[in-house]
Amino acid sequence: MKRNVLLFISLCVVGCVMTYAQQMPGLLQKGKADTQDCKAWVDEQLSEMSLKEKIGQLFIHTVTPLQTQRNKNNIYAAIKEYKVGGLLFSGGQLSDQVLLTNYAQSLAEVPLLITFDGEWGLAMRLKGTPRFPRNRVLGCIQDNELLYEYGKEVARQCKEIGVQINFAPVADVDVNPRNPVINTRSFGGDPRNVAQKVVAYARGLEDGGVLSVCKHFPGHGDTEVDSHKALPVLNFDRARLDSIELFPFKEAVKAGLGGM
């Protein structure tokens, strides 16, 4: 059964990938640092930076991937004037994101971190890319190995367009039907199942070479406020938080995952 499911998913993905790959311009490779030299390279870069440049490295600038002169001017200013450490592309066309990534990397003295908010893959933000089910559907899968393979496939697609960090997976436990913003973004209402899915998917991302970021700490599943518009409050005692909201995040920490 597992083999049949994987075959079905693979066929769907291949069909979609062939379509979007034909539209995608080549990615400008900046080079890959040798693992043993990474720390020395980072120390050397930091030693040559001004205070302004060091501060800029802490910021990720949001860009809409549209090939416009205004967008290019925006990227130019973010990199040359404010010395940002990375970019977050959100929405638009796949080909535009790749072209703007190449443009941005060509401007940067220090290679940029290119980030993405793709909880269920590239299609969450980019048109014409492979579509996967929402997390609520994936939370019903009993074989967590499939979630791991799914994470690796999302990582592969991210790397093809130069993305190194994916702000996923959602580790919130959806236990409030009045929640206006989480819902199907969550793997479900069982903390243990959510934790298992989060760890499997995030491990797949990271084994595929893309940093995962579990969110939204300390838990956004039992709120009735959209945090994009106001500040949610969790009015629960520590025992409740440990057993539900914090449980998936603790499991992610135990698993040694890279981001939160």
Locations of the language-model features?
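Short, well-ordered coil/turn segments that N-cap beta-strands
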Residues: 56-57, 83-85, 109-112, 163-164, ...
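Enzymes and membrane/adaptor proteins characterized by extended Gly/Ser/Thr/Asp/Glu-rich
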Residues: 64-194, 216, 221-235
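Metal-dependent enolase-superfamily TIM-barrel catalytic cores that perform enediolate-based chemistry
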Residues: 197-200, 204
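Bacterial Sec-dependent N-terminal signal peptides
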Residues: 1-26
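Phosphate/pyrophosphate-binding betaalpha-module
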Residues: 204-213, 227, 240, 244-259
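Mature N-terminal, pre-catalytic/accessory segment of carbohydrate-active enzymes
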Residues: 19-41
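Mature N-terminal segment immediately following signal peptide/propeptide cleavage
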Residues: 34-66, 71
